[in-house]
Amino acid sequence: MAPLSSMMNSLQGPLSQEGKLQERKSDKEDAQSNDKAAVKGCKGKALSLPFSVESLISDRTSSRTLYTSSEAGIISPTSGADERLKLSPMALYADRKIPVESVSNLSDCKRGDMEELSDKGQSGWFQTTSYTSPPRHSSPPPCTLRKHKNNRKPRTPFTTSQLLALERKFRQKQYLSIAERAEFSNSLNLTETQVKIWFQNRRAKAKRLQEAELEKLKLATKPLLPAFAFPFPLGTHVGSPPLYGPSSSFPRPALPVPGLFGGPVTYGMYYLS
């Protein structure tokens, strides 16, 4: 008997393990079928709502078929009003008679989806975005002024006596020869280059002054209005009939005024210099 009982126990051990595995598989299949049924129920509820995308599309297709059928014949106003009442959201809601529980369940499903999307969006925002300061443009370099050469000699001002002597010599002769310039520079204790440059500057100044004087003379001689003259001298009879009184065929002698007008008079206006 003892060996038979041990044999039975050894056979019952693997059988019990196989039964447990089958029970676990059946439990998993039941859970998956329940999840699929819940998802299908949510989708069916979403499809049954009057304001869902599918219901709106179906309403549009029905209204289009009505319009196409109305093009074939004339629809009476009463029938059009009836169709509008039938297609109104309130009528659709009353016809379908959607229970309140399905609406609440669908709203819960939509809220859960919106929360998941918002959580994903916030996590992506915090992960991807990072504040970076805009790059600053470097300030432009300061304007560098032109510097004089280092080997340039300092400017030495002329004395009053030297200026008077140079001006007197310039009035006598504007261009000096090499010998005259050497002798004149030695007499004033100046270099030939200084005398040469002074004469060049003085000639340029004299040219500018001369051009300014010529411009003034042009403005002074230019009249403001063009001069005009009478076509006949004053004091002569033109032969026009008198304005008042009877006309006579004899010419009326003019009385000349001695010393007043001897010829044609011209008038002109000029600028005052």
UniProtKB/Swiss-Prot annotation:
Entry annotated with the keyword Acetylation: no
Subcellular localization is given as: Nucleus
Q: What does this protein do?
A: Involved in the development of the inner ear.
Pfam families in alphabetical order: Homeodomain
Q: Where is the composition biased (Basic residues)?
A: 145-155
Gene name on record? msxc
Sorted alphabetically, the Gene Ontology BP terms of this entry are: embryonic morphogenesis; otic placode formation; regulation of transcription by RNA polymerase II
Q: Which organism is it from?
A: Danio rerio (Zebrafish)
Q: What is this protein called?
A: Homeobox protein MSH-C
Q: What is its main location?
A: nucleus
